[in-house]
């Protein structure tokens, strides 16, 4: 039984969330659960507010700053598996936001570019994204934001250095 499932069962039984967390989980476990909780809701809320997933918006943003790029290079930049990139690009292509074509010199390479409609979508998404971020970070001071950036960067580095 994980600490999280134990917590859930104890909360149901006792109705005392704060007491349960303090009594049965380490601070490190609480950090992990809070990060997992944020990760679960941020994508859903972001898409609800902006009308586009974070992954697709990231792809469009990269294409916004590139004239044309190979699909494999795009995949490396976003660090999403190639099957997911293909699915995202197919969906974006069906909505007229990107176009794909085979490279004439090497038919194995697919080139991707942003369409005018995709460029307009990026520009309109900027305001929606800013509003989402502003609401997400409400009640978080500038100093706390800088600290959060630093802590999350160090945690990400630590995670990357964990040997699996």
From Swiss-Prot:
CDD domains: HTH_ARSR (cd00090). It holds the Pfam family MarR. Keywords: DNA-binding, Transcription, Transcription regulation. Residues 28-157 form the HTH marR-type domain. Residues 71-94 bind DNA. SMART domains: HTH_ARSR (SM00418), HTH_MARR (SM00347). GO terms for molecular function: DNA binding; DNA-binding transcription factor activity. InterPro entries: ArsR-like_HTH, HTH_ArsR_DNA-bd_dom, HTH_MarR-typ, WH-like_DNA-bd_sf, WH_DNA-bd_sf. PROSITE patterns: HTH_MARR_2. The keyword Transcription applies. It comes from the Bacteria. This is Uncharacterized HTH-type transcriptional regulator YdgJ.
